[in-house]
Amino acid sequence: LSKHAHFGTNELYRKYSSTTEMLSDGFITTEYAYIAAQRIFSQNPQVRDIVVGKVVAEQDGSFNYVNAVKKLQSVTNEWFFLITDAVDDADKLAIAQYIETQTAMYVYSSSDVKALDSADTTDIFSKLKALNLMHSLGMFVRDTTVVSPESAWVGRFASAVIGSNAWIHKALTTLVAESFTRTEWSTLQSKNAHFYTKVGQDDSIEGSANVAGGEKLHVILGAIW
């Protein structure tokens, strides 16, 4: 779900089974939606298709992500994992609180360095943890230029049978592993933030395998389904 200038008037989404289809519809390779889709479709196993939604400006010209999610829900329920181009923590917080009441999961990322400070509670991971939110799942990326890393994560595990994996200990195609100190590793885990790093010689998504509020992800997915 992102801001873009594609689709027809009043058209809020389209389904795609490849990025080639998106290029045919006018998307370019530097757009958020394309990059997110490319990360998703690059994984193995690969998802069959995705819903690409559109965030439309409100009458005053502002963008309200919760309203955008509601509008998307009003026209299609053929999605479960929500990924957005929201940047501000306030938007991420609002999305997470709304999705908590829905049959869906919100997967987000952040490069806020405060997440690496064990004493800091103002980063988005700490905020969602404090609210005990069970339908949100977060990923920390040190490199601020990386667009939608969570899409690779969702793409890798979304098609798996619930309970067959913990959403960690696997490589994610299109992402570059980052280095973390043991202290940073521990801090991120304590905040239920996941991260892409090296374990020995292998690139791997690591973390607590918990949702924002602290419960195991596979438990939450099992309860929802």
Residue ranges and their predicted role:
Residues 1-225:
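Surface-exposed assembly/interface segments
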